[in-house]
């Protein structure tokens, strides 16, 4: 019977705050939905990719160079290497497209056949699924590469191309202009790559003793693998940021609502104590509804994670090639979400009751004496303000808890909205910043074999204005591989602080932070000590740069050769024609820019989802707290109405308080948005790409405008509420 009475009382109190509790439930639901969805997605994605790498025997190390059968035998003698396989990878230009031909490997980096069969002769090939799907290529179609016609006999997927990356500058290539085709083993006369696998770690120092090579690329240093690891970190970052903010704000609203309810019902609580009701029972009466709210809201959020995760799978499958992604429940994150929501609601509700639980029944039942402040002579500034303005200031200072929570909620909404738009701006600005401040090339030409520096392969003409040579190698720092580009000290196509190239290494800021070095410090690169001479604010085309003269002081055996050309042209179409005549492989600046456009097209839906959640957060907080303020100030508004204040003047008072909150929350939100963007930039950076926070002025204006519009709905709610007030109802709440 007692339990039944307590339950009835709890339901009645829930009914009294139904609108606010509905808003809090929405915040908790979204927090649980975000948390459960992103962590479930991360776990499923990690499991699927790990299984794919294991099943298709993803190579632990890829060696690049010119290899013979004798080189393979040398490696077979090593007890640490379990599997070795030769193959050839070569890029060709075919019109506006880049075609990468790869000889099939049967032991390592095995492809997955989706349709057809594998090639058996040199006249056949299989195409990677991303390109075939985008260009609507079917079995038995003809695929032309370098003037040779190949019959398409199959469509495949590859563990190397889960992310459709072409190079360090094109890590999200356009399937319309970049094709990957696999050919038979005997298609190429020689091999330029060796794939290695081992049950233990393969050390580069050991391989160096066995045979010469151009580059040693461990699995963790491949672009495909780095992007996979980067996405895992990004999921975790988003899974913590958004849910934490939503949970904390909902718990704060619970604290404020229950605190106010207890002040209103202090006589009832005193009566319950006098009748022998224990503190535990009183806690149950007032906190049960909030605990149930947290439990059921988070449970609904967990249930909704299924369709939302499926939606993310579809979005992500447009960015990566992993059709095996399928939803399954991970009970750990469901339990964590339910526990955080339920305990958080219970703990914050309990904290709001601590003061009144300590009181004796007589004190609780006593009439509350309003706090009277010492009368002060108003300053000249305050006297010059209107009554409405002074009332708005006084009301804000009198209700510090609600005022602070309103400002905090609007700041959080502003910060998350600016963060979402700024994330989009930062990615968009990478390529523009790179070509505006650093790179001035129109083409990058990759030579199949290094040439002596005094040998020119392209003649300067009306189509080719300027060309500058460079040697692109791999540099190992702290057991990680990085692009090492050696060029002349007077290079102008790249803005490299030429006076610093002869003094040491010029590195991007991202590398400097990662290695914990600054100008003048030394690092060990390829087992040689080198000095950092300059640090550049680069986001794209990340590499270690130095001059031939300085490199020869570090690496005595360095040959005077080049394998890369940076080319400028006033007539790009004529330049393309000249490069094609020379049968040279090249990439254009426009193709590098297209990489980021493709990435943004794929991420557009995710950005929209983040923006929607930010708007929901702001609208919910404003609705809940505004409704609470209106309920509490019923008598004040009734008194103002009786004293002759029109509804328009009362709304002006509310509007001025709203403007004061906006003036505080929007700048705080801007600071929070910038801080969030700076905090997560490391998770969105890799050895080939570093995100630099960059927010456009338009994003600031749009964010402030959206938050102001959301806040203006407060006036509509207030107008409707004040219209419904009656004198009798106002007298009922006079005591409060």
What are these regions (language model features)?
Residues 1-33, 261, 287, 291, ...:
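N-terminal Sec/SRP start-transfer signal
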Residues 15-25, 30-58, 309-315, 319, ...:
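Alpha-helical transmembrane segments
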Residues 38-39, 79, 85-120, 151-159, ...:
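The feature marks short, hydrophobic/small-residue-biased sequence motifs that occur predominantly
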Residues 62-63, 387-514, 518-521, 527, ...:
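Juxtamembrane segments of multi-pass membrane proteins
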Residues 113-183, 499-550:
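Hydrophobic secondary-structure segments that place a key small or acidic residue at a functional site
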Residues 17, 252-291, 620-660:
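Interfacial "coupling" helices/loops that link adjacent transmembrane helices in transporter permeases
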Residues 41, 45-49, 99-105, 203-249, ...:
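Peri-transmembrane interface segments
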Residues 255-259, 265-267, 291-323, 331-358, ...:
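Small-residue-rich transmembrane alpha-helices
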